[in-house]
Amino acid sequence: MAAFFVPVVAMIIIFAQRGIFPFGEECFLRTDMYHQYAPFFSEFQYKLTHGGSLLYSWDIGMGVNFSALYAYYLASPVNWLLILCPKKFIIEFMTILIVLKTGLSGLSLSWYLKKHFGVNNFGVGFFGIFYALSGYMAAYSWNIMWLDCIMLFPIILLGLEQLVKEKRGTLYCITLGLSILSNYYISIMICIFMVIYVIAQMILNPPKSFGAFMGTGLRFAFYSLLAGGLAAVVLLPEIYALQVTASGDFDFPKTFSSYFSIFDMIARHIGNVGTEIGLDHWPNIYCGAAVLMFFLLYLGSRKITFREKAVYCTMLILFFASFSVNVLNFIWHGFHYPNSLPCRQSFIYIALMLFMCYHAYIHLEDTSWKSVCLAFWGAVSFVLLAEKLVNNPEQYHFSVFYVALLFIAVYGGLIYLYHKGKWSLDAILLTALAVIAIEAAVNTAVTSIPTTSRTAYVKDNQDVEELVWNIKSDTFYRVEKTDRKTKNDGAWMNFPSVSLFSSTANASLSDFFRKMGCESSTNAYSIAGSTPLVDSLLSVRYGIYGDQQPADGLRDLSARKGSMWLYENKFTLPVAFMLPSDVEGNWIMDSGNPAHVQNDLCDVLDTEHVLLPNESVTEGRKLTFTAEETGDYYVYVTNKKVKEVTAVIGEQTESFDNVDRGYFMELGRINKDVEVRLEAGDDGSPTLQAEVWRFNPQALEAVYGKMNRNPMVLSRWTDTELSGSITADTAGVMYTSIPYDKGWTILVDGKAAASRKMFDTFLAVDISEGTHRISFSYEPEGLGTGAWITGVSAAVLGVTVLAGISRRKKKDRAVSGYSIRKNHKENKKSQKKESGSKQENRTKENEK
């Protein structure tokens, strides 16, 4: 149990030292956990506690396939415990899960080693601790959606070994299926390795005949496919959803290249080396300084067969190649290059390395002192050589080499005491446990668990939630929160929103947002940069602000709570309306300039332009302009080399980043004749080439009037349904601001109508002249098929298990019957022999 409790206690102590709630006002929301996981957990909790649909959500990114998002981020079965968790403790719920799953990962590897080697010694926990507090976990423990797979992996290994050696595939099938269900992405890497590992196992345990070889291969294929089938109900909707993301494109590398040397990678075994979660490809493979010794002991052990050494060392070399060679890196990561978070399969390498080292550990008693000395000095020499050759001062502080030497010396000393019998075995084991706990905990403390302010993260939540909860709207609406902490604030605080940051982001929406001057990237799009025209097109009826807004004729104050102000936009288009017939064919959206795109819509509708140019002067990195009229001003930077801009508006200063993504910088309302100064903050002195625009409210009113002539009047709006009526003056197309998804079914007057994709982004349907009843219903593409496959797979597995139990019972009865018959025969023989012996004795007595 040390493999569980030591990592758990270590994590709790580190959390307390960091001041993580309840020990302080910090929280462990690192990178994507801050921006994605916490908001999505909140949305899931809200649906569970309020009875919402798990198929679709309006609170995320204009409306998303929630079943796909669930499959990608939330599918761990333990996440359903959120139904018992109050909203205000969601962050702590996630933190507790991380701690427990870290401990269970250590316990899992220890259990695997115990079962594989058939031993039950105290030392098995040492290697579990190193697995749970490895460099991989130090880098990625915040990535809560991966942890189930890390925890299940050793059990999957055991299941595969049972499949090969004992022809029993149930454990393998169930654990692999659970892994795929929990997180398909990491499971891709596990599945790739399973193909490698089954070959390795057949080399180590060669089948007795070709038929046995084919049987093992077919058994492996059957149970692997069955495992995928068990997860199909979650997997299939996700696969369909990912096809419309930017990651859906496939571009296999055309050349081979290597990122770094094997020596540099092995040096990553040294403790307290900075973890890599960026784009530099480095693997996080620390799993204890003792590994540097025990790996050499493994190679030198005479108790371990050459065949095993060859097989496992070959797998290690394959992993080194996978970390460094671009093509293998591409394949391991699901035929895509990872966007940061490199070498996501390195936990498999760590498990293999610890397996090899534990095999050497259990043969310590039979290892000569000479071999121990050679391994010790080999490890010391490697560290000294790494200090000389590794040139990466950002991640390798000079002290890490001395600390590594210190721990190697301690482990060498403990082995010496064991060999010479200087201490009792219990004293040596307890000392080793303490040293291992300290080493692993120190590495985690030094290289992991950064914190952020919990107070700041939840600061305005209660005010915003109360404002949104009290909205009494009789129609569809979306809400814009201007002071955003993340692009998923709608999910975090449960209101219909526009922005999204997710790997399941629709690529078409990202393109549309970029064309309209809003922020977008490969896996995100945001309301940042939107003009009132864009808000209107996207049905953004409400805006939440951190301060009172000046009167501009475009919005009215609706409510206030604490420091948050809720405004209602006057010119918000409905979720669906008949689009003027000339818009779809004539609106030019690929001009490359969002101001021109928005103004071109005005040209098509024959209204004034919504964005009017304002003169400006550029001098190198600086741009200045004077407001020609009072109004809302926007700046569009045309030089994509500029990424950061600082704007000085009177006495106020505002900073913008990622402006190379092509979004409007919203400067807010500026009075006439106020001078504004902007400066690029990038290195290299790029010229601040930009355009200044002022919004024209009168033009927006005219656009709204023309586009709102034939709106859809809603009578019902739920997570997966919309219904209402619409009157079309002439036959045409009904535009909706619902992202196009094949899962939507549209009925017009009770009859199915063919939906289509409008502006390459939105759901639309052709409508004939007259008044019509319209209804929308949603079911994720692939859900029905996936549910059917899962049901069949579960039934097949059940039948297979029952058949296996039946065969074993028959075999046991046969063995039992054979034993009874054998014993009966032996008893008869014994009786005859005894009878003969008695007769012989009587004969001898008579002769006497």
Could you describe each region identified by the protein language model?
Residues 98-116, 121-205, 216-244, 379-384:
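Membrane-embedded helix bundles of polyisoprenyl
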Residues 78-83, 107, 502-626, 640-641, ...:
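A cross-kingdom signal targeting lumenal/periplasmic-facing segments of multi-pass membrane
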Residues 14-117, 121-154, 178-182, 273-281:
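Active-site lumenal/periplasmic loops and adjacent helix-entry segments of GT-C-fold
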Residues 40, 603-828, 838, 847-848:
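Active-site-proximal, structured, solvent-exposed surfaces of multi-pass membrane proteins
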